[in-house]
Amino acid sequence: MTNKRLSPQHKGAFVNTIFSGRLKHKVAWIKENISKTSEKKRRKEFEKFCAMGGEVRDANRFSSEELATIYVELFTLRWQGKIYCFKYEDLVRTFDALRHLIFGSVLFLNARPCAFDIIFMCSSPEWIYFDDINGGYDPQYTTLNLGSILLWLNTSNARALCAREKKTMRFSLGIYKEFWSYKKQWCDIIPLGRTIF
């Protein structure tokens, strides 16, 4: 099967392509800046999380086996079989091979992991691309908005890294579909391009 889709980042880079708002497939890119209201709200949620004993740990502190275990457990808790989870063995191999690209944090509460998103990062001379694959969280803490706290932390750290390196941030939450409308509060929804032939 040939994939004809192109990232918005490639607009103008190739001939034989089309980019139009009428194209069906769209991608969700985190907005360049967060509003003061949203920043204040996320900071309050984070402070509440910390006051309850919550911890933030760098994903790179964990072995590939530990990350795979954390991911499978939290993804399964979050989605309850509604979405296919990567196999443990495949995750370990992926984390081993792409260790140098891993980015982000793992949230802990009561000494147990409670939220984690797989994020891979790569850098070019002009921009840094972050690909947030998907993740999971422990639904017993739904009132704490762990998913929002984690995404806020990860995107804040990504913005800070890009500012230090004087590069443009491209942080993707993947393909956009209407049933993932929550992405609109975080993202600009941008049509993907495609090849003509």
Model-derived features: positions:
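Hydrophobic beta-strand segments of well-ordered beta-sheets in folded domains
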Residues: 1-4, 26, 167-171
